């Protein structure tokens, strides 16, 4: 009830204040409010000067604990004139520093070479460890096998086989000679076709016999050249092509 009474005094005083085009109520506004509410204003001085009144002491002033400031870098920016003083201060100057989120690519030749060499060394080391763990290894020390493992050397089953196999150059030369011989055979087979049709009967018979003989010789040469075993083939000199 007391709270509602005080609230009504404040609301009425505020309305009288605004009615007179003011923003803050004065003592006269409160007196008019009390009179309108039916309160005798003349009894207030006698009530205030009574002997058995209760004196309310002011609350003790306590010093607010000072919060320690964090590490500051630089001097904070002061508030402009349009910002009230009870607003918090501006943050430290390092708050506004821009920090790029990407790194510039390294373009120094020496740094790139060192980085490539270290990556290559790491790859070789990782591959060596993988081969040592998955395959057969040899150790430098007889007592401790796990120290300094080396990849075991695997000898060839037939060590003399590499000396007997022809090299790539010899295979290429053999293919060139085979292709040149086939071209010569096709030229000799197509030779009787250029004989004119106006020849007499004996000439046609001789041409047919010559064609049969060349075909038989070509088939024999082809059979001789088609040898599966490369070690049994006859030695052929490479054909030297002259530049035109």
UniProtKB/Swiss-Prot annotation:
Acidic residues: compositionally biased ranges: 173-187
Gene Ontology molecular-function annotations: protein heterodimerization activity
Record-linked InterPro entries: BTP, Histone-fold, TAF8, TFIID_su8_C
Biased composition regions of type Basic residues, renumbered to the chain: 234-244
Subunit comment: Component of the TFIID basal transcription factor complex, composed of TATA-box-binding protein TBP, and a number of TBP-associated factors (TAFs).
GO biological process: cell differentiation; transcription initiation at RNA polymerase II promoter
Disordered: region residues: 172-244
Keyword annotations of the record: Cytoplasm, Developmental protein, Differentiation, Nucleus, Transcription, Transcription regulation
Function according to Swiss-Prot or TrEMBL: The TFIID basal transcription factor complex plays a major role in the initiation of RNA polymerase II (Pol II)-dependent transcription. TFIID recognizes and binds promoters with or without a TATA box via its subunit TBP, a TATA-box-binding protein, and promotes assembly of the pre-initiation complex (PIC). The TFIID complex consists of TBP and TBP-associated factors (TAFs). Mediates both basal and activator-dependent transcription.
Gene3D superfamilies: Histone, subunit A
TM region(s), chain numbering: none
Protein name: Transcription initiation factor TFIID subunit 8
Record family assignment: Belongs to the TAF8 family.
UniProt biased composition (Polar residues): 208-220
Motif window: Nuclear localization signal: 231-244
Compartment(s) of residence: Nucleus; Cytoplasm
